Amino acid sequence: MASVGSRLTRFYISRPGVIARRFLAHAGMDDMGVSLSRSSLERLEFDNVALKKLPLDPSTEPGVRQVRGSCFSRVQPTPLKNPEFVAVSAPALALLGLDAEEVLKDPLGPEYLSGSKVMPGSEPAAHCYCGHQFGQFAGQLGDGAACYLGEVKAPAGQSPELLRENPTGRWEIQVKGAGLTPYSRQADGRKVLRSSIREFLCSEAVFALGVPTTRAGSVVTSDSRVMRDIFYDGNPRMERCSVVLRIAPSFIRFGSFEIFKRADEFTGRQGPSYGHDELRTQMLEYVIENFYPEIHRNYPDLTERNTAFFKEVTVRTARLVAQWQCVGFCHGVLNTDNMSILGLTLDYGPFGFMDRFDPDFICNASDNSGRYSYQAQPAICRWNLARLAEALEPDLPPDRAEQVLDEYLPLYNDFYLSNMRKKLGLLRKEEPEDEMLITELMQTMHNTGADFTNTFRSLSQISCPTQEEAEDESETIKQATELLLHQSASLEELKAANRPSMDPRELAMLVSMAQSNPALFQMISDRGTVSRQLERLSRLKELMDTTEEQLRVKHTEHWSDWIQKYRQRLARECESGVDVKDVQTERVRVMNNNNPHVVLRNYIAQNAIAAAENGDFSEVQRVLKVLEKPFSVQEGLEQPGWMGRGGAAIPGERDETEEEGSNSSGAGARGLVPYDSKPPVWANEICVTUSS
């Protein structure tokens, strides 16, 4: 044991409204028989710069209200009854210098990490922000269920990479589901077990995939209950209140700057701090100085500085959405209040990883118009950047913003092509035809209903052509085709996928209304929705007249045509006298490091949630461990620890403040399903929704 000598310890004594700080010698206290030992959570060193640099709401009155001229409001988290850990993420907690095992053993750990008990140095607060939700300005939103706890100083010795990602050396921690705030609107500030587990698992899964994201350190549940109408059918039930610990350099978002917005011409709403121009400038200065220090140092001219800042946010956003597209991730609620100013994936609600590839994939069942579909994400992110630019006027001149926005699409395309070349193992050359090869791959996947994750993972098994194979190229293509046919959809799967969600009679009525009474039609529906439903109906009719054998012939033609082009492109990777075996070894390595073996599919999350709702948290913990190594082929993936035999559901949580939930109408009996397989039939019943 280290010598105690004259070493001093900072000792906190909590009293109502007061924290008295005393410096006492270890030896003296030991003589008095008083223990000075504090847990690692109680030793966290806070430096809450955001509350020092940005204005705090002077009002402490309880209840929902408009907060003007302030960025944060002080709050008191509502304690949970008998909180307990569901799971913790060791890598995420390590950012704070915490050891996961020590945190799990701490009897006060669940209380501290749910906000039920306030850690020394923590200053609970809720952040004020606005947002465009589904294209309409919604006015004040804010942290309706989340609570800022403070900013923890990172432990010494963090990697240079981490310091680049987080130059402040502080990690903001917040608890989501900690109770009422001034921004809770009609909700209760609580989250339930379902949505909390989804956010916890997906935060860590996305990080492990190499995609920028906020982190999740823990998920805590409790004996506190809230009422939720799970299926939106008027039959509410009581559910367990749960809390996620979220970690990021900052949770400031595009919508943080929209609190200064003038009255919107369409909705009539305005930001609560409209007219407080000096506050907008102050917030902009805070963000750039703390999170973009190189820009702050290198651009003394304010216009140039603000333009450089907006350019960097644009670059990060373009890179982020390109990474989403390349792993088949759909966010679900890309409102401006869910867009990070740091280019991080923020707010996991009705997200989804694609199973069967569909460019029109909509993971959020509340998104009736498909505004936030998979293929719409790049354009929506540009639209959100344009709203951010408007919010920064006049600190960011409109002409400068437009110049930057013109660069967004080329930036996105470059990031996307770069990532896709790695996924296809095209490493030695960049050819103009690569873009068409990728486009044709996606079209083939769509035509065959191929599984997104497994198809890309399988491509590394298609080798570069060798001299020996040249004599029997047709057999090689046949074998590769069989490989990808295994990941393609069956006739019944395609029928289920293309079944319209609208009754054909309702669809016919809407088509007639669109022609006879366009104004009424616009009030009831939109052309995009009807068009997608008609396309589904048309394809379903075609499938009804197709046999399984005919479908296989079509799929075989699609895949063999593309594989032939792919092999020709791979042959050009091996020109100039290179060793084909060396090229093949390197491309397999790169491909397997860019094409995950396992992602957080909805059925995996559902099994973990159903087990947890039955009191078994082991499946959440097991799934977390698997998702921490998504590119590895791990043992035991074929035998999930919990199989969900009882038909338990993963229904949705009504949440008027932000997002998310997931609804399922009863999954029926379930069998053993590997984590790395195509989803089981019952997974089609999972319905993830959003209520704003």
Curated annotation (Swiss-Prot):
Role according to the record: Catalyzes the transfer of adenosine 5'-monophosphate (AMP) to Ser, Thr and Tyr residues of target proteins (AMPylation). May be a redox-active mitochondrial selenoprotein which interacts with a redox target protein.
Transit peptide (first-last residue): 1-24
Residues that bind Mg(2+): 338, 347
Cellular compartments annotated: Mitochondrion
Active site: residue positions: 337
Catalytic activities: L-tyrosyl-[protein] + ATP = O-(5'-adenylyl)-L-tyrosyl-[protein] + diphosphate; L-threonyl-[protein] + ATP = 3-O-(5'-adenylyl)-L-threonyl-[protein] + diphosphate; L-seryl-[protein] + ATP = 3-O-(5'-adenylyl)-L-seryl-[protein] + diphosphate
Recorded family membership: Belongs to the SELO family.
Required co-factors: Mg(2+)
Name by which UniProt lists this protein: Protein adenylyltransferase SelO-1, mitochondrial
GO cellular component terms attached to this protein's record: mitochondrion
Sequence positions that bind ATP: 142, 144, 176, 188-189, 246, 253, 347
ATP-binding in keyword set: yes
An example Gene Ontology molecular-function term: AMPylase activity
Keywords assigned by UniProt, alphabetized: ATP-binding, Magnesium, Metal-binding, Mitochondrion, Nucleotide-binding, Nucleotidyltransferase, Selenocysteine, Transferase, Transit peptide
Disordered as annotated region, ranges: 637-676
EC code(s) of this entry: 2.7.7.108
